[in-house]
Amino acid sequence: MKFELQNQFVAPSIEFLKRLPLAGYQSIARTRLIKMLADKNDEIVGIQQDLIKEYAKKDDKGELIVKDNQYTFTPENETAFQKAYYELMIENGEIEKATYSHHKEDCQDFLLNADINVSGDEATCYDALCVALDVDFDKR
């Protein structure tokens, strides 16, 4: 299965999918989708760490400086970091993994028929996931 999803929705999609009450083949489809998203999330976290290493202040030994459990930045580097981080998060990430022949259709089905109330950020995440997986609400 292959689809694109904005990076900012990858981690929240995992949490959203975990909340869905599913059984049988739908649960299996969800678990495989979560694994795909988790792999993409690991990639995003790695890139975030690379950005921190590039822009955060370092001591004379080259170690990142952490103050009050936060990395420190010069004003210029903080602006550059925030810009790079924003660009990373709004980027459409390509997610692809061989699963099984009807995986996408199974995911579309459980998303279309999800019996869960959502609002706020979770609703935005649900919508992004439905768009990414081409869920057709006209079928309802």
Task: Give, region by region, the residue ranges found by the protein language model.
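N-terminal interaction modules that seed assembly of large macromolecular complexes
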Residues: K2-D60
